[in-house]
Regions:
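Pyridoxal 5′-phosphate
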Residues: 1-262
Length: 262
């Protein structure tokens, strides 16, 4: 994500706004906050409503104005499992003329995701979470329409179409996503995650999701039995694969764990 932001055409974000929600993954916010001054953009964070645990889609849309050069959408929140209405968000972003990116980390490997329906400009993820991989392997998708306009600052011999070009006067970016490669890649994290990817490729993804829905329904029932308020939306269409509850100080954690185990 850092490489992508730095690779955008000079001036694309300067004097404009980058929009994120308060429930985006903190590392993304830390990164953008640190880049704002150097790249001349204003980082705008859509706030929570009073007492809320996730940002409402309506509030995000209201803050998404024509001055937004880039919006980073959190498909599924890491703290509540709230899932945004992605088609509605993307349609609004197109009307605003913004670049639209989506962080799919909290649902990739469980929920179906198609970069073309609706069409987003970029998507980022990791090999962790539902992907069942190891730390260190990331995912970057970039629309072919955008690739040719991006010039990554961090570049090396693998950034070229022919990585064996040693003529220092003839560097040229690869025409595709390989331009975001740089030096000799560290392959161990990717290799360590390969068994998980192979496993996913051999599974019936609809069956996995159906199994998840059965388990999460049991968790919701258990939370209701304990009188624990849900932080996660109840409708399946509005949540990812996790269930989060608010645990009152007066309720002993061991009691909650024992109930869930039962």
């Amino acid at each position: 994500f850092h490489s992508l932001v730095q690779s955008l055409p000079a001036g694309h974000l300067h004097g404009r706004t980058v929009l994120v929600g308060a429930d985006c993954f903190p590392s993304n916010h830390f990164l953008l906050n640190g880049m704002a001054e150097a790249h001349g953009f204003t980082l705008k964070t859509v706030a929570f409503r009073q007492g809320a645990a996730h940002v409402e889609d309506e509030d995000f849309l209201n803050d998404w104005t024509p001055d937004v050069g880039l919006a980073l959408l959190t498909w599924v929140s890491s703290t509540t499992s709230h899932r945004i209405n992605l088609p509605q968000m993307v349609a609004h972003g197109r009307r605003m003329g913004s670049l639209i990116g989506v962080d799919i980390t909290q649902a990739a490997g469980l929920l179906p995701f198609d970069v073309s329906a609706p069409e987003v400009d970029f998507a980022v993820s990791t090999s962790l979470k539902w992907m069942c991989g190891t730390p260190g392997a990331g995912v970057l998708y970039l629309s072919p329409r955008l690739i040719a306009h991006c010039q990554p600052e961090l570049r090396g011999w693998f950034s070229q179409d022919n990585p064996f070009n040693w003529d220092i006067t003839r560097f040229a970016y690869a025409p595709d996503i390989r331009r975001f490669d740089n030096g000799t890649p560290g392959v161990m994290a990717a290799l360590a995650s390969l068994p998980a990817l192979d496993w996913h490729a051999a599974q019936d993804q609809a069956h996995i999701l159906a199994h998840n829905r059965k388990l999460t329904a049991r968790l919701i029932d258990a939370a209701d039995d304990l009188g624990l308020p849900l932080l996660t939306p109840r409708p399946e269409t509005k949540r990812g694969g996790s269930i989060m509850v608010r645990l009152p100080d007066a309720l002993p954690a061991p009691q909650v764990v024992a109930t869930l185990r039962a």
